[in-house]
């Protein structure tokens, strides 16, 4: 499968599964799991999967703790993200998402537990007009001692953020064949 920058043989993988249940036209429940293999340092092969061109924000929690920034102290533990979410479509123009993520390492690390922490993400979207959407969200994360070691920081401090975004996507070229 090639070699990494340290000339180690790479043997890594990613697996993803998502299931959704549409209750009615307004409510949908979603469950998903993403597994990115990690390296525990006990092999002659490097087993940590590299997303390379990531979509971290979309899949691994809105707070971008994973794969938008590197792991610290030489760790490459991979990631196991289990998500449970609900979507409420209030109207044709307004929808809301609430997602819970539980993060753990994919690889067993010496003297550390696998649990990294949990995150809750809330987002509301409003289609103001044809090409304009207003979105807002709020997220918070509770990390563990393992998170402190592999990512840095202090798991006892409250971690949260809120945001507002205006997305303008005009159709600039339309060709009909």
Q: How does the language model describe each region?
A:
Residues 26-29, 92-98, 126, 130-136, ...:
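Repeated loop/turn-to-beta-strand initiation elements of outer-membrane beta-barrel proteins
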Residues 130-157, 170-174:
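C-terminal beta-signal and adjacent terminal beta-strands/loops
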Residues 1-3, 33-39, 100-106, 140-144, ...:
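Transmembrane beta-strands of outer-membrane beta-barrel pores
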Residues 46-52, 114-117, 151-157:
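Flexible, surface-exposed loop regions and adjacent strand-edge segments
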């Amino acid at each position: 499968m090639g070699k990494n920058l340290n000339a180690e043989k790479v043997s890594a993988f990613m697996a993803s599964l998502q299931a959704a249940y549409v209750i009615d036209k307004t409510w949908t429940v979603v469950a998903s799991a993403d597994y990115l293999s990690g390296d525990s340092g006990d092999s002659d092969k490097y087993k940590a999967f590299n997303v390379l061109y990531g979509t971290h924000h979309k899949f691994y929690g809105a707070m971008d703790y994973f794969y938008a920034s590197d792991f610290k102290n030489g760790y490459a533990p991979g990631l196991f993200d289990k998500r449970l979410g609900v979507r409420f479509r209030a109207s044709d123009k307004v929808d809301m998402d609430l997602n819970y993520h539980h993060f753990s390492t994919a690889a067993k690390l010496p003297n550390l537990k696998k649990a990294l922490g949990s995150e809750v993400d809330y987002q509301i979207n409003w289609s103001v007009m044809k090409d304009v959407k207003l979105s807002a969200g709020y997220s918070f994360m509770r990390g563990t001692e393992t998170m402190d070691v592999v990512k840095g920081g202090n798991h006892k401090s409250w971690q949260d953020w809120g945001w507002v975004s205006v997305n303008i996507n005009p159709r600039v070229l339309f060709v009909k064949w």
